Regions:
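Conserved beta-strand positions in the central sheet of alpha/beta enzyme cores
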Residues: 2-5, 41, 79, 141-144, ...
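Active-site acidic/histidine proton-transfer and metal-coordination neighborhood
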Residues: 11-114, 124-125, 135
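Histidine-acidic metal/acid-base catalytic patches
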Residues: 95-210
Length: 210
């Protein structure tokens, strides 16, 4: 297992709950280390009603930095994702908007926080995938290969059949020396057939681009 995905809610308006979220994540780090899992996908938190932009960013930055210190003790690597809305949450990701995601990215420099770039979520927000990827490229560690059939909302589809610009993405990261993990996020509900088609497509495109 290469990656464990977690759902820390560091933008919760209750400070006590934010502290609990950090404790939960610390336990996840410990579990991952015991299982030999290197990467831990982390998020900023939910877009709770009433939480101001500046407060949410401040809290997310504070707790992500603290989380990185804990992760280092366990020898695991936290990777921050441009997420949309996980089924486990009531609200969308606070940093689903591309400008918030990149601001949190910029404010967590030099603490060991790397990036897991999802190929569909920026499109689902309605922003420019390549523009955002270019900004976070210096700390790119892993990729979630996913696709969406619509812009402005997330509608998972068979990988390679939607709007995600895989050739452009792979070309850019290859040019910049990326040789990390590309994880398949198959959401077209086709079971193993969908996973096999996604793997074939990703391998084909990766092999074709320079």
């Amino acid at each position: 297992v290469t990656m464990m995905t977690t759902y820390p809610d560091f933008t919760h308006p209750d400070k006590q709950q934010r502290e609990r979220e950090l404790e939960y994540l610390a336990f996840d780090f410990a579990q991952a280390a015991q299982l030999g899992i290197k990467y831990i996908r982390v998020l900023a938190g939910q877009a709770h009603p009433g939480v101001k932009r500046e407060d949410g960013i401040m809290w997310a930055v504070e707790y992500l930095k603290r989380a990185c210190g804990i992760a280092a003790k366990y020898g695991v690597v936290p990777v921050y994702e441009d997420h949309a809305k996980p089924g486990a949450w009531d609200y969308i990701d606070f940093s689903h908007p591309a400008d918030i995601f990149t601001e949190i990215y910029e404010k967590t420099e030099d603490v060991g926080l790397r990036v897991n770039f999802d190929t569909a979520n920026i499109i689902a927000y309605g922003a420019d995938t390549m523009e955002v990827l270019q900004k976070v490229l210096p700390r790119l560690e892993t990729i979630h290969a996913a696709d969406t059939s619509t812009r402005g909302t997330l509608n998972h589809c068979e990988i390679g059949k939607g709007l995600a610009p895989f050739r452009e993405i792979f070309s850019l990261i290859k040019e910049n020396g990326f040789d990390g993990w590309i994880c398949i996020e198959e959401g077209s509900m086709q079971g193993m057939d969908g996973i096999e088609k996604a793997v074939r497509y990703v391998r084909k495109v990766w092999g074709e681009v320079k």
